[in-house]
């Protein structure tokens, strides 16, 4: 069966088939090889791309800008104070304005509905750079990195997310794993298990692809035989102190330590993280956490983060290659 991703938006991985997702991942591999060989393409030549960032970013912004420019596109960045979206101008109106000027739009913000509205009314491909509910571009990089390091087919890679089971990255990983027919464990406290809507959607997809979704409260049981141990920050910046205290109490037993990695009983297991990570006190936030809560490490220990099992910087680089693949697949000539 043939397919064409041109002019498709990239809002959530559940919108894609296994074959379509594999195509984007394989394209990312090809584009990465081409970049390493010194080849700069022109698949996006003459295209104008808008990057809407309601939330600041390092990896996502750089990945879109470098990826677009590598393939010949022009990029306009609209930061948190650089547009009227949702404040002085509705998302629907913004979509129609930008759709008349740009060939593609990246959106990184709060609401998944805003991303959907942009896609509905702009008339051009819209790419989800992160919302409170989902983070699909991150998952392509996570999967590509795991395949590169583990030398396994996607369907044979077993992922375990350890931490907040309602996290947007965990949601995206769960949906992506279901699409690819993978086994995916959410290792989380009872209070933070995935929402029924996301879990039901992932299970419905997995039933068709041969994937397996497991929710587990016990860390040792949840990580056994896993290939990839994944975590994310416990609390987003700007949340009140009470939330930090509550989350730390709930999630401290789910910190990824050397013992957690050993509990996989898999000597080849790797550690992934979407970054930034609070693994030491080298940042102002890290220092504040230590002063206020007595923790020098949060979701992952520095020992694991800096270990040979950690592939977080290869994973970060792959954000650019996979995002470039999404743009080329949906917008390229």
UniProtKB/Swiss-Prot annotation:
Substrates-to-products reaction catalysed: carbamoyl phosphate + L-ornithine = L-citrulline + phosphate + H(+)
Binding site for carbamoyl phosphate: 57-60, 108, 135-138, 274-275, 319
GO MF term (any one): ornithine carbamoyltransferase activity
Highest taxon of the lineage: Bacteria
Documented EC number(s): 2.1.3.3
Principal EC category: transferase
Subcellular location: Cytoplasm
Pathway where it operates: Amino-acid degradation; L-arginine degradation via ADI pathway; carbamoyl phosphate from L-arginine: step 2/2
InterPro entries according to UniProt: Asp/Orn_carbamoyltranf_P-bd, Asp/Orn_carbamoylTrfase, Asp/Orn_carbamoylTrfase_sf, Asp_carbamoyltransf_Asp/Orn-bd, Orn/put_carbamltrans, OTCase_ArgI
Entry GO terms, CC: cytoplasm
GO BP terms in the entry: arginine biosynthetic process via ornithine; arginine catabolic process to ornithine; citrulline biosynthetic process
SUPFAM superfamilies named among the record's database cross-references: Aspartate/ornithine carbamoyltransferase (SSF53671)
UniProt KW keywords: Arginine metabolism, Cytoplasm, Transferase
Annotated positions binding L-ornithine: 168, 232, 236-237
Sequence similarity: Belongs to the aspartate/ornithine carbamoyltransferase superfamily. OTCase family.
PANTHER family hit by this protein: ORNITHINE CARBAMOYLTRANSFERASE, ORNITHINE CARBAMOYLTRANSFERASE, MITOCHONDRIAL
Free-text function comment from the UniProt entry: Reversibly catalyzes the transfer of the carbamoyl group from carbamoyl phosphate (CP) to the N(epsilon) atom of ornithine (ORN) to produce L-citrulline.
UniProt protein name: Ornithine carbamoyltransferase
């Amino acid at each position: 069966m043939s397919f064409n991703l041109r002019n498709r938006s990239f809002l959530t991985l559940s919108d894609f088939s296994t074959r379509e997702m594999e195509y984007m991942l394989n394209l990312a591999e090809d584009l990465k090889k081409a970049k390493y060989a010194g080849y700069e393409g022109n698949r996006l030549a003459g295209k104008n791309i808008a990057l809407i960032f309601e939330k600041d970013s390092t990896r996502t912004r750089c990945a879109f800008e470098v990826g677009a420019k590598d393939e010949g596109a022009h990029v306009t960045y609209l930061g948190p104070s650089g547009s009227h979206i949702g404040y002085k101008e509705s998302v629907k109106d913004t979509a129609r304005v930008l759709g008349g000027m740009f060939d593609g739009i990246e959106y990184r913000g709060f609401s998944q509905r805003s991303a959907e509205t942009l896609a509905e009314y702009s008339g051009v491909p819209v790419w989800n750079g992160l919302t409170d509910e989902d983070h699909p571009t991150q998952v392509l990089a996570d999967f590509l990195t795991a395949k590169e390091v583990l030398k396994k087919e996607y369907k044979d890679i077993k992922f375990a997310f350890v931490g907040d089971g309602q996290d947007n990255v965990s949601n995206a990983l769960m949906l992506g794993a279901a699409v690819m027919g993978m086994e995916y464990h959410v290792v989380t406290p009872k209070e933070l298990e995935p929402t029924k809507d996301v879990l039901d959607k992932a299970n419905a997809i997995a039933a068709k692809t041969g994937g397996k979704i497991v929710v587990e409260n016990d860390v040792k049981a949840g990580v056994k035989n896993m290939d990839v141990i994944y975590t994310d920050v416990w609390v987003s910046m700007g949340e009140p102190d009470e939330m930090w205290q509550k989350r730390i109490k709930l999630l401290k037993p789910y910190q990824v330590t050397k013992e957690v990695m050993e509990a996989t009983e898999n000597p080849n297991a790797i550690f992934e993280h979407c970054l930034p990570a609070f693994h030491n006190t080298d940042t102002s936030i890290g220092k504040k956490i230590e002063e206020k809560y007595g923790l020098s490490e949060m979701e992952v220990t520095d020992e694991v983060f800096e270990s040979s099992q950690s592939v977080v910087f290869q994973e970060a680089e792959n954000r650019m290659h996979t995002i470039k693949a999404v743009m080329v697949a949906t917008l390229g000539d």
